[in-house]
Regions:
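Acidic (Asp/Glu) carboxylate-rich active-site/surface patches
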Residues: 10, 14-42, 52
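A short macromolecule-binding patch
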Residues: 159-171
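Single conserved hydrophobic/aromatic residue that forms the stacking wall/gate
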Residues: 1-13
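Short, mixed charged/polar active-site loops
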Residues: 29-32, 134-140, 160
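SH3/SH3-like beta-barrel fold
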Residues: 152-156
Length: 177
């Protein structure tokens, strides 16, 4: 996501990260990242990542227009998708090499936190699926940043707790962000 943030900053886009896997502009989703992995304690069988970037979409239907945007809608300019992909791949490659060298995200925490849309804002944590939420599966807290493992650090009742993406869905108090 920081790679996308870097590409966005080069295009003069005011993008932010919605932990754990979305990039937003002005409160609307412009990019999503999906991952799937099969692993054991000491062995990864496979990892698959998919990235979708709304590049030149000119409009969204009624159900998405308040939640999604594109580079074109945000800048008024069409983007060359091949150049966008190349810029992202180049930025991602640098971040990935550093991650592999360090073995964790320590080198990126400060930069990520600067791009975090919900930093120092109240968030709602849904433990499980949002649509199945019951009061005992909902927590509220203040997003404080991420740790070296990529967990969102959420302050709940004065105590900071790391929250992993597989456990929750994060929503801002005002809605999606």
């Amino acid at each position: 996501e920081i790679s996308l943030g870097l590409v966005g900053s080069e295009m003069c886009i005011r993008d932010r990260i919605k932990w754990p896997n979305d990039v937003i502009i002005d409160g609307k989703k412009i990019c999503g990242i999906l991952t799937e992995m099969s692993s054991e304690v000491q062995y990864v069988h496979y990892a698959v990542m998919g990235i979708g970037i709304n590049a030149n979409k000119e409009k969204f239907d009624e159900t998405l227009k308040d939640k999604a945007t594109s580079i074109y809608l945000s800048t008024g300019k069409k983007v060359n998708r091949a150049k966008l992909t190349a810029a992202f791949a180049d930025a991602f490659g640098g971040y990935y090499r550093r991650y592999m060298q360090d073995g964790d995200l320590s080198a990126f925490v400060e930069e990520y936190d600067e791009l975090l849309a919900n930093k120092d804002k109240e968030v709602i944590i849904y433990h499980g699926m949002v649509e199945d939420a019951t009061p005992d599966k909902i927590s509220r807290g203040i997003a404080r940043g991420i740790d070296k493992d990529g967990a969102l650090l959420v302050e709940i009742d004065g105590s900071v707790t790391p929250v992993m993406s597989g456990e929750v869905s994060i929503r801002g108090v005002q809605g999606y962000v």
